[in-house]
Amino acid sequence: TYVFWGGREGTETDLSKNAADAIKRNREAMNFLCEYVLDQGYDLKFALEAKPNEPRGDIYNPTTGHMLAFIETLDHPEMVGVNPEVAHEHMAGINFMHGVAQAWEAGKLFHIDLNDQYPGRYDQDLRFGSRDIKAAFYLVKFLEDVGYEGMRHFDAHAYRTEDYEGVKDFARGCISTYLVLKEKAAQFNADKEIQALLAEINADDGSMSQYFGAYSADKARALKEQPFDRSEISSKGLQYERLDQLTID
């Protein structure tokens, strides 16, 4: 898998170029590259990495969601996926795990960059898990639960204060954090109290199952006639506070 980060593909003033034409040029380039790979008989795929800004003032296709939509317009979308990066999505204030889940569900999670980041700031590339350990846990748990087998790439760097030994501490820290969170994810999945609570939270009485699946006019008609007691529904707490605290505990 070859990763593309289009850090050059952006603008500081939207009067400098037509944004739609810029997307078309990106599409033409990716189509050309895919055809070249096929013509040469290479066993190669591409992963597109999104970033909202830096070094350009604004970068086209700034998030993983934008990239997923763009990929579906290509001539060979099966050859192109995404490489989500923690820091880049957090720069845009987005829930990273949700973007990863969307990419995975679409069959487009070809690669992933792990680091950490304060939201809304320049690209910091902090040690994985060093800022938001809970978000890092959610991510690791998702990757392990779905059986992701691709690369786990630590696109990060040590604090500017570190010497050579500090850089080695940083590298070991990235790997250690992932492995610790992997172990904690297994512990979460095996915890009887947590699993009992999840079963209660997600319990389904089957009352809506008749509406599942494909559309039909009969289903739509019945759904519009389905009574809902809003007071009864809203009176039952969902116990998310307890679940969240058990996760921390």
Predicted regions, residues:
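Gly/Pro-rich active-site loop or hairpin
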Residues: K17-A20, G57-L68, E78-G81, H88-E149, ...
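Arginine residue identity/basic-tract feature
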Residues: R8, R25-R27, R56, R121, ...
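C-terminal extensions of enzymes
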Residues: Y164-D249
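Short non-domain terminal segments
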Residues: V146, R152, S209-G213
